[in-house]
């Protein structure tokens, strides 16, 4: 494959959905080593380019669903620290946020992640220890973002799911995420994982961490 063509495809990877990026990278590497005739390589390039364009379009289509600006309830300690937390997210792979009950961690952290640019290429996963918490928190965040449940914010628990392709934030129980790890060890569909109530130190939350 022509180096300029290869470079063009690699540059597009950072705009593709995270769940597609590794698969596309493997295809690019395979094409780079291919000894196929130029005509066949051109066909392969065209097909891969179309797949990548579709993945990019899906990621970019989420942008119009996200409120601009994202607002935070006044009076919550986490709201007052939103800019600081956003900066930490942008510069660290792992952060720990500690605060009193009612400080806004559960409902505001996913919004801060959205504000930091996450949730477009991959989901913001938000783990809760119980099914009721997952569904109620999803409804609350969706309400604050003025979005119907299942559109921008969705949830998945045992026997119940409200998720669409447009979702940026996914609430779930620890068990759901653990089951996904079995089929996707890298959790490639997620850009961010929030483990709430981590202080409970269940076996599942320890595995996630």
Predicted ranges, named:
Residues 123-141:
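Conserved Walker A/P-loop ATP-binding site and its immediately adjacent core
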Residues 164-166, 181-192:
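Short basic/glycine-enriched coil/helix segment immediately N-terminal to the Walker B
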Residues 91-95, 122-123:
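Pre-Walker A (Motif I) flank of P-loop NTPase domains
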Residues 207-209:
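Conserved small/polar residues in nucleotide/adenosyl-binding loops
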Residues 1-86, 91:
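Helicase-associated low-complexity/disordered flanking segments
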Residues 93-109:
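Walker A/P-loop
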Residues 142-180:
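Inter-Walker segment of RecA-like/P-loop motor cores
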Residues 107-119:
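Walker A/P-loop NTP-binding motif
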């Amino acid at each position: 494959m022509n180096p300029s063509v290869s470079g063009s495809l690699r540059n597009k990877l950072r705009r593709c959905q995270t769940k597609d990026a590794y698969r596309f990278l493997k295809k690019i590497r395979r094409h780079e080593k291919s000894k196929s005739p130029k005509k066949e390589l051109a066909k392969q390039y065209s097909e891969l380019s179309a797949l990548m364009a579709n993945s990019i379009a899906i990621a970019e289509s989420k942008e119009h669903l996200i409120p601009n600006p994202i607002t935070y309830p006044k009076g919550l300690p986490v709201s007052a620290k939103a800019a600081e937390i956003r900066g930490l997210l942008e510069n660290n792979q792992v952060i720990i946020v500690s605060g009193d009950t009612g400080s806004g961690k559960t409902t505001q952290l996913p919004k801060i992640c959205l504000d930091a640019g996450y949730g477009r290429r991959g989901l913001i996963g938000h783990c809760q220890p119980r099914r009721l918490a997952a569904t109620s928190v999803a409804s609350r965040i969706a309400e604050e973002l003025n979005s119907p449940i299942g559109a921008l914010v969705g949830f998945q628990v045992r026997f119940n799911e409200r998720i669409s392709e447009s979702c940026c934030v996914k609430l779930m129980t620890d068990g759901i995420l653990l089951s996904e790890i079995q089929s996707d060890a890298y959790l490639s569909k997620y850009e961010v994982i929030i483990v709430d109530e981590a202080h409970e130190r269940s076996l599942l939350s320890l595995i996630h961490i």
